[in-house]
Every structure is written in structure tokens, then in C-alpha cells.
């Protein structure tokens, strides 16, 4: 393979080594740069000599400052660059840079004729799976619900072939918490909104203990919406464990009977609600996987659908690029408000956004959170941001939304479920078996080395973009079509084939008691 290094923007003074084996000292890249040391795949090479204090630029943006002289051809990494200050929220002005609305009317018209086969719900939402969800109001019942989940899967699901799975949503909330504290609204509305996810068909089954602070009625949908049942384990009619089990199994059957009647029907792409997330990111994430996913996101938005991206600490250092994409000044201010809230949240915990990057990120070539954030936002595509959704809330508008979440894969996925996603696209460069059993998770690899090694864990390889074998546009269309196939149930994702699922993790900024 040829010596390959990728320069992201014309004024960058570093390039990314793309050769899978890395490059040896003496290798020549981009015509004139001779490596003075061995540099691993994904890491940066200096394209000019940088003196102490000089800007280090990638994506056309400053990602750091040289802490000492860095010779041309040297390895640029977290050891020789310093972290810049984050963009100051108070000085970022709203100067809209929105794409012309008339440029792609023909494409929009074509996309709005595209369809997939989904489960239409009574409230108009559409599911891509047909799942019996058991919601819990307190951690105390988790042992019972785990037992019940296995029993239903073994004994009842075979009798209801149209139901894909049963899922118990256990969590650590419900008691021993300051239930009336301002931050308590986040976990409470998260639990409530997850129970109403479109993939559950409007069937809400809540198991409570009976004495908990979080009353099941508080997380139930408004009266009259869908099928709701609440069962307390402390109900005096239950004599012992097996009577509890029988009571829950009887309740589950009433919901399974209704879910089993659901049938897939032709639905518009406008019915898709796709959550974009990245985890285990590397230097290629912002070159391949995220831009490809962003292109697919733009297609879904053009078709009238809903897409959201998240992870506050992974957009904080790119907020100056996002504010101009806000649909109006109100949305721009909401973006800045969510950044400010999280800045304060981290400050109260005596941390800052630099705590985000992992050893894996750095091993994959990401020197700091600035570089990571600039690549992370590429998965949002180029569409205008129509709304900002606070943690635990549902999306309110079609189009591209920012759903404010922590960057933790598990907390982010949980909050995106609460926001109403019926499809999940997860981009990784280092690799993670992350999966959710409530929603299909399409795993996108940023590099072919990972995709080849994890051939049965990765659903889509965006790596060919790095070497010019495919364009972002070509791969974006391919991912778009894969999303439709998975949403229709005609193709299974790797996590569903292998049964690899993570627990949900509630984000609780409120105090424990």
C-alpha cells in the first residue's frame, strides 16, 4: 500500500497517517514531508516545523498549541501540544449560515417518495421493532423483572410470533433520591418517555414495589393514551414470590396479545427518528464514519424525517460552528444555554471538558477534546438545527435536532431513546460491542482495519472513504439504504444477531439522600 497521509483542510499544518501499519521513519507523505520518526496509523504528522506557541490546525481549526519545537515530519500528539480554551459562549454571535432552501427541491421530492415498512402506532409514531417493554419505578424490583423477562422470553414469546422481544427497563432510580430536587426532573421524564418509545407500540407496563418515592403514576402516560397497566409487588393479594410472578405473567399476556396484532405497513422516511452517536472514536471518525453518517442524516432530513445528535462535551469545542446553523436566534440561544448548563455541571464536579477523552481515543490519534469535538459534529451533517432538546425530553420538531446528553455511550443512548428514536446509528473507530435491545443499532466503522477484524460486529464500513476508493456521498447513500432495510426488518444488525445489549444508564444530576 502507498504511504498515505490525509490533510483535512487546505490550511491544516498536520496530516493523519492512514496506512494501516503506520509509517516508518524516512517515509514520504504528501510529496515533500519526510517522517523523522515512526508514526502509528491515525496519528498526526507535522507538515511544517512548528515553534513553541504555534497553532496546530486540523479541520481548518486550531486544535492546540505547540509546547515545544516540533520539526516537520514529526509525530504530533497530546505530549507536545496544549489544550486551547473552549469558545467563549458569551461572545458567539448568531450569524446564520443556512443552506439555500431552493437548491435541492428535486432531491427532496424524490426522497419523499421513498418508504420503509414500519409499525404505525395509534399516536401516529412509527416503530421499527415490536417489543414488550417492562418499565420499573424503582431498582428494588429489578431481581423480579429480570426473572420475569427470561420467563416471558422462554414461555410466552413463542406463542406471539409477531413480537420481537421483551425488555425490562431496570435502573438505579426511584428511592433514596431527592425526588423534588430540580435535577430530579431529568431521570423522571427519561423513564416516562422511554416507556412511550415508538418501538413499544403504546403498551406501557409498569412494575413498582409500592413504597418507593417515584410513584408509577408519575411515569405513566396521560390517561387514555395507549394500553397502560401498573402492578405493585407489595399488593396484598400476592402470597409469596410465585404469586407475584403469576400476576405479572398474566398482565404481560394482555399486552402481548395486542402487540402481536401489530403489522408492518408502508411508511414514509418522514417517520424515521434516527439518533446519531459515536463512541470509541479515533482520528478517522471525523474523516469517514461521521461525515458519511452526516450525509445520510441530511438525506433523512430532506425526506422530512427526524435526526438528532448529542454529547455535549463532544460538541462544546465546536459550538462556534453549530450556532450559525441554528434555524433562528431562539435555537441558537438554547444551544448556548445547554453548553453553559453542562459547563457548570462539570465545574460543580471539579472537572472540565478535557476529562472526556479516553486512552483509546488518544491511542487512535485524537490528541484532545477539541480535535475529538471537531470530528464528532460531522455526524450532524449540514442541515439547519431546528430545535434543542434538554435531557430526558422528547423531540418536538421534525428535522435536525440537538438532544443534550452526556457523552457516555450508555447515558447518551438512554436519553436518545427517551427523545423518541426508532433507529440508532453508532460510529466507532476503536471498536465497541455496544448495543440496545429496544432499538436497532447500526454499527459504523470509521476504518476498514477494524471492520475486517470485527467482521461480525460491524454493520457498515466507512473506511474506503479514507483512501478515495469511495466518496462520502456514495457511502452516505449506501448507509441511508441500509437504515431503510434495517428499519423495515429485512436486515438484522449485528447486535440483534448476536444478542449483545447494554444496560440503560439514567443521567441523574440530582442528589441522592
Could you say what each language-model-derived stretch is?
Residues 1-423, 427, 432, 438-513:
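Metallocofactor- and cofactor-centric catalytic cores in central/energy metabolism, strongly enriched
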Amino acid at each position: 500500500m502507498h504511504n498515505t497521509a490525509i490533510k483535512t483542510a487546505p490550511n491544516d499544518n498536520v496530516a493523519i497517517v492512514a496506512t494501516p501499519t503506520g509509517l516508518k521513519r524516512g517515509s514520504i507523505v504528501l510529496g515533500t514531508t519526510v517522517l523523522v520518526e515512526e508514526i502509528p496509523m491515525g496519528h498526526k504528522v507535522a507538515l511544517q516545523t512548528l515553534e513553541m506557541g504555534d497553532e496546530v490546525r486540523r479541520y481548518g481549526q486550531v486544535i492546540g498549541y505547540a509546547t515545544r519545537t516540533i520539526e516537520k515530519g514529526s509525530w504530533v500528539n497530546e505530549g507536545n501540544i496544549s489544550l486551547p480554551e473552549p469558545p467563549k459562549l458569551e461572545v458567539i454571535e448568531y450569524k446564520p449560515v443556512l443552506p439555500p432552501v431552493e437548491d435541492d427541491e428535486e432531491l427532496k421530492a424524490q426522497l419523499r417518495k421513498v418508504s420503509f415498512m414500519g409499525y404505525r402506532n395509534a399516536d401516529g409514531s412509527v416503530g421499527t421493532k415490536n417489543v414488550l417493554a417492562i418499565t420499573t419505578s424503582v431498582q428494588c424490583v429489578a431481581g423480579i423483572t429480570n426473572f420475569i423477562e427470561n420467563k416471558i422470553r422462554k414461555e410466552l414469546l413463542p406463542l406471539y410470533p409477531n413480537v420481537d422481544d421483551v425488555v425490562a427497563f431496570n435502573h438505579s432510580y426511584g428511592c433514596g433520591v431527592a425526588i423534588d430536587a430540580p435535577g430530579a426532573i431529568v431521570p423522571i421524564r427519561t423513564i416516562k418517555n422511554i416507556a412511550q418509545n415508538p418501538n413499544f407500540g403504546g403498551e406501557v407496563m409498569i412494575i413498582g414495589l409500592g413504597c418507593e418515592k417515584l410513584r408509577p403514576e408519575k411515569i405513566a402516560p396521560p390517561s387514555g393514551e395507549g394500553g397502560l397497566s401498573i402492578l405493585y409487588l407489595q399488593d396484598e393479594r400476592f402470597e409469596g414470590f410465585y404469586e407475584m410472578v403469576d400476576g405479572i405473567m398474566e398482565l404481560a399476556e394482555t399486552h402481548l396479545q395486542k402487540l402481536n396484532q401489530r403489522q408492518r405497513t408502508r411508511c414514509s422516511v418522514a417517520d424515521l427518528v434516527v439518533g446519531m452517536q459515536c463512541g470509541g472514536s479515533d482520528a478517522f471518525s471525523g474523516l469517514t464514519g461521521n461525515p458519511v453518517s452526516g450525509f445520510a442524516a441530511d438525506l433523512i432530513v430532506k425526506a422530512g424525517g427526524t435526526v438528532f445528535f448529542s454529547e455535549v462535551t463532544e460538541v462544546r469545542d465546536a459550538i462556534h460552528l453549530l450556532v450559525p446553523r441554528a434555524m433562528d436566534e431562539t435555537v441558537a440561544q438554547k444551544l448556548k444555554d445547554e453548553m453553559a448548563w453542562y459547563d457548570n455541571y462539570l465545574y460543580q464536579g471539579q472537572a472540565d471538558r478535557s476529562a472526556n477523552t479516553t486512552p483509546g481515543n488518544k491511542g487512535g490519534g485524537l490528541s484532545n477534546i477539541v480535535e475529538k469535538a471537531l470530528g464528532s459534529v460531522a455526524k450532524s451533517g449540514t442541515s439547519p438545527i431546528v430545535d434543542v432538546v434538554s435531557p430526558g425530553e422528547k423531540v418536538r420538531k421534525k428535522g435536525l435536532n440537538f438532544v443534550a446528553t452526556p457523552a457516555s455511550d450508555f447515558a447518551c443512548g438512554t436519553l436518545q431513546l427517551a427523545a423518541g428514536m426508532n433507529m440508532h446509528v453508532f460510529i466507532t473507530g476503536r471498536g465497541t460491542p455496544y448495543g440496545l435491545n429496544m432499538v436497532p443499532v447500526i454499527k459504523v466503522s470509521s476504518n476498514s482495519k477494524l471492520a475486517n477484524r470485527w467482521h461480525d460486529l460491524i454493520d457498515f464500513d466507512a473506511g474506503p472513504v479514507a483512501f478515495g476508493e469511495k466518496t462520502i456521498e456514495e457511502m452516505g447513500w449506501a448507509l441511508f439504504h441500509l437504515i431503510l432495510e434495517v428499519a423495515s426488518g429485512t436486515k438484522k444488525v449485528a447486535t440483534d444477531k448476536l444478542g449483545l445489549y447494554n444496560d440503560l444508564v439514567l443521567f441523574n444530576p440530582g442528589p441522592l439522600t
